[in-house]
Amino acid sequence: MIKKETSFIDLKQVKIDDPFFSRVQNVVIHTMLPYQERVLHDEVSGIRKSHVIKNFRIAAGDEKGTYYGRVFQDSDLAKWLEAVAYSLTVEANPELEARADAIIDLIGRAQQPDGYLDTYFIAAEPEHKWQNLTDCHEMYCAGHMTEAGVAYYQATGKTKLLDICCKLCDHIDRRFGREAGKVTGIPGHEEIELALMRLYQATGEERYRKLAAYFIDERGRDPEFFHKEAAARSWSRTDYMDKQPPSYMQNHKPVREQDTVEGHAVRCMYLLTAAVNLAAQNYDEALMAACRKMWDNMVDRRMYITGGIGSTYYGEAFTVDYDLPNDTAYAETCAAVGVCFFAKQMLEADPDARYADILEREIYNGTISGMQLDGTKFFYINQLEANPGMPTNAYGEEEYTPERIGWYDCACCPPNLARLMTSLGSYVWSSSEDTIYSHLFVGGTASFETAGGVKIALTSKYPWNGSVTYTVEPEQAGAEFTLAVRYPGWCHQMQVKVNGIPVSGAVKTDKGYWMIQRSWQPGDTVSCEMEMEPERVYAHPMVRADAGCVALRRGPIIYTFEGVDNGEDLQTLRIPREAKIEVLPYQADLLEGIVALRVTGCRKKTAVNPALYAEDAAQEEVVTLQAIPYYAWCNRGMTHMRVWMQE
């Protein structure tokens, strides 16, 4: 039997003051969110039109016009509203809140009397509601709107959007299920499941938990459900999804019987996020065991070193074990965000540092690589190798442009990244009655109810420096509790001191946390020194794309080589195994502040022999190479880039 062993503390209990993420949050709150707001209102020229606000006005009857955009365009606005809710918790903004309230009023006017809410089917094809669960994303949009409703209520105390979402989910509950008179359908794109669990936890209404359980349990019962639906209907807005195998939508077998991550990577992450939450709520060990197996398969065989998941453009999907191509990697930003959701739920159910290690990898690498440093351009995909001008993908899609752009036709990633970064404080700490867990070394202060009330301040220069200090302020002197500090998987040596006195290594648990149990006095300090030397990292021998190659890592940061620093044709470079890796001083004026690495390498001379093939190996010259953090690449113009270098 399992249960939630710990719970992440509320965003309102955390104040981030961090040398790295304070800048990121400031950019998101003061630049990215306003920029996205203008995009949603179609006020930014030279980019893809959104039309989402106009779609709601048309659906509400406020103006005449024709629906424009993807069938799931509503979700862009929902995710932006959710990000706004978190930003209001981080930093009050009455003007932004008033504009969000006006948008919520608009959403309420668009909602139908029976609770239905989807602007495409309200404005364009009302006769076809709920006829294409495969790819028309009505429940996907409902899920994102529900997440926004919960977040906005928790941030502001206002219930209007929450009430709209309850009415919407009640409508879905009346329609779907195994009871007589209901439809035994499931959504093609998971999202409603995790949203229903959040709605249940916010309202206490059991029907929402039961509906989430129905959608999770029903998936995979009939692997041909979506194909049967396609064959039965005479109408379809698109038949793209109709051709996908059941595994694409994780419908190939019941969730409890699945043991590998399959299909569309984002859908899979959203499903597993909901499944772990449900398993912990229901004490469902069988469901939890399946989630653990899929986590292990993902991390051990199907994840890029940057945290990216999804190896192929076709279906934005997982493929097979160890298939991790670099120049055609998909590694969608939304998928990396989804891994964070999954990891957070796994940590609540089982506070094991291996889940926090992946969460950390994502927030410092695979997620924020999706945003330009100024917050106004975005990557949909996150390749590990870029060769501008080369036809590395056969599809010609804008997602594969090796340069961030201002918006996308399918703009799911920009607001998804915004809601993750504005809610980051809720990923750092969790607590139980007698234990406080420090999962991420993100600086700031946090308040806990543990042991009668505790406040902890964390200070550091992380991720550029491995020194971290906790200052503990219990409300009651002598309060007894355990402070659990993560021992990162990348760290080979970590020293922990309490009030300057070394702590015995015996307190480190097999789940990767230093368990510091004591009677705490106001002003007690815990200082951690983590060895942070640059390291070479090698892929599993079965990863064909990385054979004979090496990547560089320092602390939680994965590094990459850009043409800006090292010239083009990065494939002609190699890093000898004996070459020493030098850590350069922190450069505040480079890429908003980074620590770069320098290493002596070799470059093959290409002009000596012009023959395409020759008997003699190319001559080499010694060169000095510089590596920068992967997340910061492509912020100095379109350029060549490579994470895995020949050795």
For the regions a protein language model found, what residue spans apply to each?
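Extended ligand-binding groove/face enriched in aromatic
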Residues: 58-72, 78, 87-190, 194-251
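Well-ordered alpha-helical scaffold segments within catalytic/enzyme domains
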Residues: 21, 81-94, 143-158, 192-205, ...
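Low-complexity, Ser/Thr/Pro/Gly-enriched N-terminal "stalk/linker" regions
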Residues: 1-76, 101-121
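Beta-strand-rich binding/interaction modules
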Residues: 478-499
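Short strand-turn-strand beta-turns centered on an Asx-Gly dipeptide
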Residues: 497-504, 555
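Catalytic-core region of carbohydrate-active enzymes that cleave or remodel glycosidic bonds
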Residues: 274-301, 324-376, 386-387
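C-terminal beta-rich recognition modules with glycine/proline-rich loops and embedded aromatic residues
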Residues: 19, 212, 291, 353, ...
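Solvent-exposed loop and edge beta-strand segments that line ligand/cofactor-binding
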Residues: 3-6, 60-77, 128-141, 174-189, ...
